[in-house]
Swiss-Prot record:
This is Uncharacterized calcium-binding protein C613.03. One of its GO terms (molecular function) is calcium ion binding. Residues 1-20 form the signal peptide. GO terms for cellular component: endoplasmic reticulum; endoplasmic reticulum lumen; endoplasmic reticulum-Golgi intermediate compartment; Golgi apparatus; Golgi lumen. It is found in: Endoplasmic reticulum lumen; Golgi apparatus lumen. PANTHER family: NUCLEOBINDIN, NUCLEOBINDIN 1. The lineage of its organism: Eukaryota, Fungi, Dikarya, Ascomycota, Taphrinomycotina. PROSITE patterns: EF_HAND_1, EF_HAND_2. The keyword NAD does not apply. Its main location: endoplasmic reticulum. InterPro entries: EF-hand-dom_pair, EF_Hand_1_Ca_BS, EF_hand_dom, Nucleobindin. Ca(2+) binds at D87, S89, N91, R93, E98. SUPFAM superfamilies: EF-hand. It comes from the Eukaryota.
C-alpha cells in the first residue's frame, strides 16, 4: 500500500486535530496561537502576573469567571478538577513549577465544553465573530451585519441603552421635528 506525501500530511493533520487536547484547541481558537510551550501557556493565563494561578485565573481560563449563566456547582466542579490535578500543595495556588510538573507527567486540562474566554462580551464578540465575518470591522457596510449573532448582539446594546422604552419612545430622541421641512410633515386630519 502506497501513501503519497500529501496523503500522509493530510492524515497526520486529521489525526492531530481529532486528538488535540483542550489546551491546544483553546490556544488556537482563543488566542490564534498554534505553537506554544507549557510555560507560555501558564504565563499567558496568569492574569495578574503573580507567578501563580488563583481561582479567578482558573475560572477565567475556562470563561467562567464573569459568566453568570453557568451555575456555581459547575464552576466549582472545574475548580476542584484543576486544583486536584495541578495543586499538589493544596494551597489553592498553582505555581509555574506545579503546572510544569503536571504537564511533564502527561497531564492535560479537562475539556468541560467551555472554549475559554478572557474578556467581556464585547471582546469576545470582536474576537470570535467580527474578526471572522466582518474583516473590515466598522467600515463594513451596514447590510453585512445581518448574522443572528449580530442581531442578538445589537439587541443587547438596545436593551442596555434604552431599557424598556418602546420603539416609538426611542425614536423621539432621534427625530428633530423642527428640522423636517413643512412639505414632508404630516397634517392632522
Amino acid at each position: 500500500m502506497k501513501f503519497s506525501t500529501v496523503g500522509f500530511l493530510f492524515s497526520t493533520i486529521l489525526f492531530k486535530s481529532a486528538f488535540a487536547g483542550w489546551m491546544d484547541t483553546h490556544m488556537k481558537d482563543e488566542h490564534h496561537i498554534d505553537k506554544y510551550t507549557d510555560e507560555s501557556f501558564f504565563r499567558l493565563h496568569d492574569l495578574g502576573k503573580k507567578g501563580y494561578w488563583s481561582d479567578q485565573d482558573i475560572l477565567s481560563l475556562y470563561g467562567l469567571f464573569e459568566n453568570d449563566e453557568v451555575p456555581f456547582v459547575k464552576k466549582n466542579e472545574v475548580l476542584v478538577d484543576v486544583l486536584k490535578k495541578c495543586d499538589p500543595s493544596g494551597n489553592r495556588r498553582i505555581t509555574l513549577d506545579e503546572f510544569l510538573a503536571f504537564r511533564k507527567n502527561g497531564g492535560e486540562l479537562t475539556d468541560f465544553g467551555f472554549p475559554g474566554h478572557h474578556g467581556d462580551e464585547e471582546e469576545e464578540f470582536e474576537m470570535h465573530h467580527v474578526e471572522k465575518y466582518h474583516p473590515a470591522g466598522l467600515d463594513e457596510p451596514d447590510e453585512n451585519w445581518n448574522h443572528p449573532e449580530d442581531i442578538e448582539h445589537f439587541q443587547k446594546h438596545d436593551e442596555i441603552f434604552h431599557g424598556d422604552k418602546k420603539p416609538e419612545e426611542r425614536r423621539k430622541h432621534f427625530v428633530k421635528y423642527n428640522n423636517i421641512p413643512d412639505k414632508y410633515r404630516r397634517v392632522s386630519i
